Amino acid sequence: MKTITLDPGERLAAGQLPRQGVLPAAIMQSAQAIVDDVRERGDVALREYCKKFDGVDVDDFRVDPKLMDEAIQAVDPAFIEALKKAAAQIREFHEREVEQSWFTSRADGTILGVKVTPISAAGVYVPGGRAQYPSTVLMDCIPAKVAGVKRVVMVTPPQKEGGISPYTLAAAKVAGVDEIYAVGGAQAIAALAYGTDSIPKTAKIVGPGNAFVAAAKKIVSGDAGIDMVAGPSEVCVLADATADATVVAADLMAQAEHDPLATCYLVTCDAAFAEKVQGRFAELLAASPRAEITSASLADQGVVVVAADLEAAIDAVNVIAPEHLELHCDNAMGLLGKIENAGAIFVGPWSSEPLGDYVAGPNHTLPTGGTAAFSNPLSVQDFITRSSVICYTPEGLMNDAPATQTMAQAEGLWAHALSAGLRRKMVEEGLEGFDGVDLGDINRIAWPVDLAAPKKAE
């Protein structure tokens, strides 16, 4: 791991961090070509890409729903128990996020409010092929169902024999997925965004994927909603000498084993503790079945920040704005209020980050690459729309029309003022409409009073 030592009064700079930055132009170009092709040729293009990238000939992308039931019977009952426990706790957490439509009224009878509506269909991308991520199925599909989305569609790359992992299928059953399609990559994102003969389009697309999936999501984001353009996973551990070095090392490795590009930060005021943590890696890596990936991540993307004091350490955490933050330090809960930027915060020595990955309840789809400074975890809010509701009475109109016309005149928007002025005239003169009515001076209906020009400074 690279070590950055901050002198007293020195701040960590964002430029010192191993950010992956923007998606490479070559990947964006490749993804754009795939998206355009699927948009134009639909299922024909999808089949060609499935053969090219997954090595599978696909006749029907739609996965038979009965395979979900068969998967429930095929996997170890202990896995089903774990799935159901995780699903229950994820559902319970996200039910607290549910918004209701609300309305309020003024004394003049005007009604104002917000109408909350679930989106029509949500597309969920679940990585597959050689890997299997049933936790992603739960985390991305359950909030959509809690929000009231009637059509939750899952896409995932087929395995070499053309099927889907039984773990993924079992999770889809538990999560309440409505449709599953065996297709992955940028081509799956294009299908969800624009629709094909086999795969009807969805209003929003969520879920993690490789760089091509991320690029495709970015490309289609003007035509379908997306949750985020996610980069490699990351963890930041803020620790002091009260933490256990072996546990902290394991927590860093838990992120590093995802991907050679996964980023691990250890922030501390104790250089000796940082060395102690790094000294634990060799023993733990010797037992790890993913040692090669983990070692590469720690060596190339791992960073130790040694700060002069706790204030500087917390400032460094906020500059990093990590996807996952662990507070392994004395009075961890007392520090919570000082943390400004983090996707998920794991407080205290017992709050293992993998608990949040799988079963705690809060969502594990989190902003990466410093975007936690302005972005949020996936939630029920990602699967709803909010519409403002405005309903005026004649009395309410008369109260607000004059100010509306004045504002419109200041902006030079004559028809805006006329729209309010015509209604005002109807109320003032008891008219039901303007058929056969002489409007007279239309300009005075729009702008009853001329605004004085702004005074010039003397």
What is each of the regions a protein language model found here?
Residues 99-104, 225, 262-267, 287-298, ...:
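Flexible, glycine/charged-enriched surface loops at secondary-structure junctions
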Residues 3-8, 179-184, 304-309:
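Short acidic-hydrophobic, aromatic-tinged amphipathic segments that line or gate anion-handling sites
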Residues 228-300, 304:
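A conserved active-site cap/scaffold subdomain adjacent to cofactor or substrate pockets
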Residues 1-120:
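N-terminal Rossmann-like NAD(P)+-binding subdomain of aldehyde/semialdehyde dehydrogenases
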Residues 104-170:
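Conserved small-residue-rich beta-alpha loop and adjacent elements
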Residues 174-247, 251-254, 258-263:
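Conserved NAD(P)+-binding/catalytic subdomain of aldehyde/semialdehyde dehydrogenases
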Residues 318-455:
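C-terminal core of ALDH-fold dehydrogenases
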